[in-house]
Amino acid sequence: MASLKVPATVPLPEEDAEQLYKAFKGWGTNERMIISILAHRNATQRSFIRAVYAANYNKDLLKELDRELSGDFERAVMLWTFEPAERDAYLAKESTKMFTKNNWVLVEIACTRSALELFNAKQAYQARYKTSLEEDVAYHTSGDIRKLLVPLVSTFRYDGDEVNMTLARSEAKILHEKIKEKAYADDDLIRILTTRSKAQISATLNHYKNNFGTSMSKYLKEDSENEYIQLLKAVIKCLTYPEKYFEKVLRQAINKLGTDEWGLTRVVTTRAEFDMERIKEEYIRRNSVPLDRAIAKDTHGDYEDILLALLGHDHA
């Protein structure tokens, strides 16, 4: 599942903190040292390193990284060094700003995280920005997009595997009726997608395909130029096949005229500890090229090195 490679024997946080402190000293920053430590520690270990660094050197490690690094490499290291909830809060805030607005990031956070992970992200958001995520999403969106996104970020889904098949059949019928009527922002359609567990939604969509001959997403393709419809399709993909969703984000980031470093960095840093191996499998299945080779072709230097390290590349 995770692509992150952590050594069997990990140095004490005090040792890692000392090595990082030394990496910032002298005439030039030792980027290789930073990568060799941070890109091979899990979230708990990175959190301990930050705490020890603050205690021993009276400095914030994130501020040190921000001061010493630059460009895409800095962004990747910073995002990776955040705690997961803290990182999601930052990404969500960036996605609501005028010049970095990205509703797809909100869908990613709401639909690919567990209920507890989303809850923790919202707590981190309140602590960091002194406002709620729901409040900001409602303020920065409008119309059908607001109608979809606010309940998405507000929900606390059941995370278990138990499924009500009778409910799945009845709600598949409801969804089909709404799609057939092109009532894409219908209250019941939004209620089902924003409140049901991922297992329940998968069962419902399976009934939809079996009973009506094609998937719900295929029906939505007719109006795929509409941003709301695109978001609706992203919600379905993130809830049911997140690896396919993230593969597409990576493919588009790499294949664009000029790499979309923001999309590339976001996916690698948020999925390396979770399901990046599945995403890599989906990428090679879809593109016939390994993800690490595609990234190596489109990036360079320290930025390339940290991305490859997080992908579990043997030489990074």
UniProtKB/Swiss-Prot annotation:
Annotated positions of the Phosphothreonine modification: 100, 112
Gene Ontology biological process terms from the UniProt entry: response to cold; response to heat; response to salt stress; response to water deprivation
Induction: Up-regulated by cold, heat shock and salt stresses.
Phosphotyrosine: residues carrying this PTM: 129, 283
UniProt repeat feature Annexin, residue ranges: 11-82, 83-154, 166-237, 241-312
Keywords annotated in UniProt: Acetylation, Annexin, Calcium, Calcium/phospholipid-binding, Metal-binding, Phosphoprotein, Repeat
Residues noted as binding Ca(2+) 2 in the record, renumbered to the chain: 254, 258, 298
UniProt-listed InterPro entries: Annexin, Annexin_repeat, Annexin_repeat_CS, Annexin_sf, AnnexinD_plant
GO terms of molecular function: calcium ion binding; calcium-dependent phospholipid binding
Chain positions recorded as Ca(2+) 1 binding sites: 24, 26, 28, 68
Highest rank taxon of the organism: Eukaryota
Tissues expressing this chain: Expressed in flowers.
Entry-annotated residues carrying Phosphoserine: 95, 288
Disulfide bridges in this chain: none
Pfam family, one: Annexin
Annotated residues for binding of Ca(2+) 3: 299, 304
Family: Belongs to the annexin (TC 1.A.31.1) family.
Free-text comment on this protein's domains from its UniProt entry: A pair of annexin repeats may form one binding site for calcium and phospholipid.
Descriptive protein name: Annexin D7
Lineage of the organism: Eukaryota, Viridiplantae, Streptophyta, Embryophyta, Tracheophyta
